[in-house]
Amino acid sequence: MTIVLGLDGSMTAFGWAALRLGESHELDEPVGLGCVRTSKEAAARHVYMADDDGRRLDEIADVLIAAVQLYEPRLIVIEAPAGAQHANSAKALGLSYGLSRTLARCFDVPCITVQAEEPRRVLVGRRNASKTEMEDWCLSRWPTSLGLLRPKASKPEREGAFDALTVAATGARSAVAGPLRPQRKAIVRASWDPTEPSQG
């Protein structure tokens, strides 16, 4: 089983999706889907913001490490940070992106990055497709994928998980993923017809 792991980085709702590659992308199938939720607790814990960020990264890393160990992906696909962000948002995106790259490096898994609008363009055909449209695309393509999420998943969890699934699906269509796909078994035909009478 060849798996592509898609990651949609965020400090608040970090989505991940494991996509099993088929002989063609029409035969790809999600086998794992989830989202890690974390929240700021620096004030409540009376700790520095940097230490609280570290705690949140640890929580995310624990889940991602477990996913890599379980699914043993052959390729990790990450959505690149994009858009104008204020300082805190930019820092959060940078931390989550760095965590994704480090995860791939530590497990020696090839890693590629896709731009934020690329899944929308490749899968839906419009760069400005909404998160709801992307989720609808996933559910139309894989009707049972919602069952991979935990019961009563919140809207942010669904968005993070399905964003990660579209990232994985986009990466699965890349030139890098092509050689990883299982090959169709060749049909060996007999050089003689067993129904014909033997000669000699």
Describe the residue ranges of each PLM region:
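Phosphate- and other anionic-substrate recognition elements at nucleic-acid/protein interfaces
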Residues: 1-200
